[in-house]
Amino acid sequence: MNLNSIEIQKIIPHRYPFLLVDKIIDMEVGKRAVGIKNVTINEPFFQGHFPDQPIMPGVLIVEAMAQVAAVICMGSEENEGKLGVFTGIDNCKFRKQVVPGDALHIEIEMTAFRRGIGKAEGKAYVDGQLACSASLTFALIDKA
């Protein structure tokens, strides 16, 4: 299953400037997905991180991974309309800087999901090189 940015926005609540996944190029709902974030110099965070040497903040790489995980979970009917929130980030490692012009290739695999709590393993690559890896834990909650 492939999704463009319009279709992604029908599943998760994130919007510009905080929508950090541009498309899903492969997905098994509830199991795994591969997403792409095209990183451009026009990203608002590059104004201050860092003006003379723009680098995507690591926490936003992790957030991009979380958004792909949210698409996996909230793409199923039983989780439609829920809100995904972090409950934990473990074993997070940053291996490569992500800069304007990079295409962040995000691979997420769900490892557990019970009673609204999910766990996923995430990896983000640039040009085939590992940029970030992390274990993500989150809860799906009802919107207020």
UniProtKB/Swiss-Prot annotation:
Matches recorded under CDD domains: FabZ (cd01288)
Matches recorded under Pfam families: FabA (PF07977)
Catalytic activities: a (3R)-hydroxyacyl-[ACP] = a (2E)-enoyl-[ACP] + H2O
Enzyme Commission number(s) from the entry: 4.2.1.59
Keywords: Cytoplasm, Lipid A biosynthesis, Lipid biosynthesis, Lipid metabolism, Lyase
Coarse class of the protein's main subcellular location: cytoplasm
Catalytic residues, chain numbering: 49
Alphabetized GO MF terms: (3R)-hydroxyacyl-[acyl-carrier-protein] dehydratase activity
Record's keyword annotation contains Signal: no
Subcellular location: Cytoplasm
NCBIfam families hit by this protein: fabZ, PRK00006.1
Family classification: Belongs to the thioester dehydratase family. FabZ subfamily.
Listed name of the protein: 3-hydroxyacyl-[acyl-carrier-protein] dehydratase FabZ
Organism: Alkaliphilus oremlandii (strain OhILAs)
